[in-house]
Amino acid sequence: MAVDMELDGGGDGKGKAPPQISLSGLFLACMVAGGVQYGWALQLSLLTPYIQTLGIPHALTSVMWLCGPIAGLIVQPCVGLYSDKCTSSLGRRRPFILTGCIIICISVIVIGFSSDIGYALGDATEDCKVYRGPRYHAAAAFILGFWLLDFSNNTVQGPARALMADLSGRHGPSAANAIFCSWMALGNILGYSSGSTNDWHKWFPFLMTRACCEACANLKAAFLVAVVFLGLSTAVTMVFAREVALDPVAAAKRNEGEASGPLAVFKGMKNLPVGMPSVLIVTGLTWLSWFPFILFDTDWMGREIYHGRPDGSPAEVTAFQEGVRQGAFGLLLNSIVLGISSFLIEPMCRRLGARAVWVMSSAVVCVAMAAVSVLSAWSLGDFGGSVQDAARAPAEEGGVRASALALFVFLGLPFAVLCSVPFAVTAQLTASRGGGQGLCTGVLNISIVVPQMAIALGAGPWDELFGEGNIPAFAMASVFAAAAAAAGVVLLPKVSVRSVSMAGGH
C-alpha cells in the first residue's frame, strides 16, 4: 500500500552540521563521481566482450559479474555503516572515498595489463595477431582485477552518495542530485568515448606488445587515462568536501551497546523508515529489468546487430569488435541524454510526483526491452534466428543498426530516473528519522545487488538455451519492467512536492 508522507531535509543527526558550501563548491565536491563513473563506463562497455577474447565462453561471462553483487552485499552496507560512525580527522566519508579510489587505480592497471601478465606467467608465446586460442593466465589476472574493481567501486559509491546528502545544505538535495548525475553523465561520456575510440594504439604504439594487439592496447590506454582522471577528481573532492569530524567521545557514547559490522546492518534493516520496505521491493524489480541490458548491451551490438563472434574467423572478430565500438558509441549518446535529463528529474517530480515518474520510467523500459528483442529477431530473422548462423552472413546495414542506436538514446531518460529517484526517495525517508544516510544507502544497494546476482547466475545459461544470443534475457527484462511499474503503483510511498525539493540524495 502506498504511504503519504511529508518529509523535510536535514543533516544526519550525528555531530555538528557541515559548514555552508557554495553551489560551485558543491559541484567540485562531487567530482569524484565523474572519475569513478569513467572507469565504470569502460567496465560496462568493454570488459564483457574483452574477456571472451581471452577464452571465457559467452555463457560464463555473466558469472564474472557476480563480484558486483557480492561486493555490494558485503562491502557497501558495512562501509555505509562505518562511514556514519567514522571519527577520522578527514571526516566520515572522505577516508573511504580516498581508500576506494586508490584500489580502483590498482585494479584497472591489472585489468589493462592482464594480457601481458598472462604472457609473463606462461600463456601462449605466439604473437597475438595469429594466436586465437585461450589465454587462461591472462583471464585469471583479468578476473582478479575485475573483482577488485567491483569491490573498490562499492567502497566509494555509498560514502560518495552520503557525502552529497551531507553537504547539500541550503541548496537542497535535489540540486545535489542534479550535480551528481551531471558528473556521472560526464564520466560516462568520457568513458564511452574512450571505449568507442579505435586509435589509442596509434597514439600510444608502445602499449602494443607480443601479447597485446590493437584492441588490447586500446583497452590498456583507456584505463591508464582513467587512472589519471580518477586521481584528479579524487584530489578535488578531498579538497572541496569540507566535512566536520565527529567527536570521538560523543560518538563512542552513542555507539555503546550497538551491534557492529554486518550485525548492525541487519539490525538496521529491521528498523527501516516507514515506506522503505516498499522502496526496496520496487528497486529490486526495476534493476532486474535493467541488468541484462547493462551487462550485455555492447555484446548484443557485436553479436545480434553486427553478426560477429569474439572467437570466430578474422572477419567475424572484426565485425564483433566494430559492433562493440558502436555499442560504446550508443552508450555515449545515452550518457548525453542522461546528462540533459538529470536536470529535468526535479521539475518532473514536482509536477507529477516521484512515484509517477518512477512508474512511467519502468513502463518506458518495458517497451524498450521488448523493442530490443524484436529488433534482434528482425536482425537475425533471415539467418534462422541463431547468432551462429547470422555470423556466417554479412552484417545487415541500414535500419537495424540505426534503430539499435536509437534505442540507446531512448533509454537515456529512464536511466536518469534510475540513477536519482530511488536514492532521493531513500534519503527523504531517512531524513524523517534524522540520520543514517550511509546505512540506508547501503541497505538500498542490497535491493540492487540481489537482482544482479540473479541475472549474473541465470542470464548466461538461459541465453545458452537459445543459441548463445541475448534475446531471451532482454525479453525477460521487459517482463520485469512491467512488474516494476505495477508494483510501483501499488507500493511506492507518495512523497509531497515540497519534500522532493527539500530532501533526498543520490
From Swiss-Prot:
Residues 1-20, 76-94, 157-171, 242-275, 349-355, 426-441, 492-506 are cytoplasmic. Signal peptide: none annotated. GO terms for molecular function: sucrose:proton symporter activity. Residues 42-54, 116-135, 193-220, 297-327, 377-404, 463-470 are extracellular. Pathway: Glycan biosynthesis; sucrose metabolism. InterPro entries: MFS_trans_sf (IPR036259). It is found in: Cell membrane. One of its GO terms (cellular component) is plasma membrane. GO terms for biological process: sucrose metabolic process. Responsible for the transport of sucrose into the cell, with the concomitant uptake of protons (symport system). May also transport other glucosides. Homodimer. PANTHER family: SUCROSE TRANSPORT PROTEIN SUT3, SUGAR TRANSPORTER. This is Sucrose transport protein SUT3. The gene is SUT3.
